Amino acid sequence: MKFGSYRRPSALLSTLLAFATLVTVCSTDECFAASARRKVVIDQDAFGPAGSNLQAILMLLQSPDVEVLGITIPSGDGWRDEEVSHTLRLLEIAQRTEVPVHPGAVLPLLNTQSRTKVWERLYGKLFYKGAWTEVWPAEGAVRRTPYHADPYLVPPSPAGEPRIKPAHESAASFLSRKVREFPGQVTIVAAGPLTNLAMASRLDPEFASLARELVFMGGSFNPVAADNGFAAEYANAPRREFNMRWDPEAASIVLHEPWKKITEVPIDPTTRTFFKPEFIQEVARGQAPFAAYLGRFGQSFPMWDELAVAVWLDPSIVTRSTALLVDVDTSFTAGYGDTLSWSIGEGPGLGERPVTVVFDVDVPKFERMSLDLLKAPTPAH
């Protein structure tokens, strides 16, 4: 166009120019959440009913700016198939049956119950062994079905049996497919053992590099027991945490993968959180379709997995974090499964990745955020 023939742009052209400007601005990380709902795959050992595992899933389902692409399930707190059943029933109650559930690893990569018993004879009893826990303390333990060694047995649930079915595609395949479908956009929020992620990494060497980031709950550094009776076991084993101890080899594999960003929420900040009885009563009075479910099955425990979810949803709740190199001890010694860490630049140089480790959070802000999400009506999706 000649300069002399310049005219005011049409309304359509103005709209197109405005849209182009919006796209340019919102292509940055700062505007990513404003331009589209954040995509997430939840990897969770979803034992239930209710409890920290499933309440963490509910928080993500209740977040209006989050698109839950699917849920992948490994064994951990319970056996995979029982956890899958709890998750499917939760989705029915929450009226979110469009979210697919993909069964993952039944067993750790290398660790076994028999190996764990040998380890205990050598080095002492483990406080908690998830699906391998045969005898529970009389007080202070989560309400759950009796111990069973059959990983494929699904006992009846007091919350009812699901009518919907899990997806046929494996967890590892689904994880790989989603990061390739949305390269650089999918966050993996993992709140159980990392077996599924390790399998995805071995199935697809580009899996981690194609994800947006990894946020995981697990590991332990030097937690301080609170006055609620939890975390006392860390006085003697401050670096031993269940998610890493269930499958140390998987955790080590995942922590060496080329993620763009890794955020770890260890046990340390969770000891100051607690899902109080009054919280259960408050969410039971809420408008969510699962209000009665949480009112009936909710239990008062530290908010382990909810905190990992909240850190991703709103990083402003973090008041202290440190960048460290992190790994997990895979030697079959007294430290098997323990968290290893070094300051940046001081690691052994075997491919350790920098991890942002969260040590302190604004607990009242976190609690209010969690309750608001769990009380709200189901968002449009």
How should each PLM-predicted stretch be described?
Residues 36-38, 55-68, 235-236, 242-381:
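Conformational coupling and interaction surfaces
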Residues 78-86, 109-110, 220-224, 327-345:
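Short, mixed-charge aromatic SLiMs
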Residues 1-8:
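N-terminal secretory signal peptides that target proteins for export/translocation
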Residues 11-27:
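Bacterial N-terminal signal peptides
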Residues 100-108:
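A short, structured active-site edge motif that brings together acidic residues
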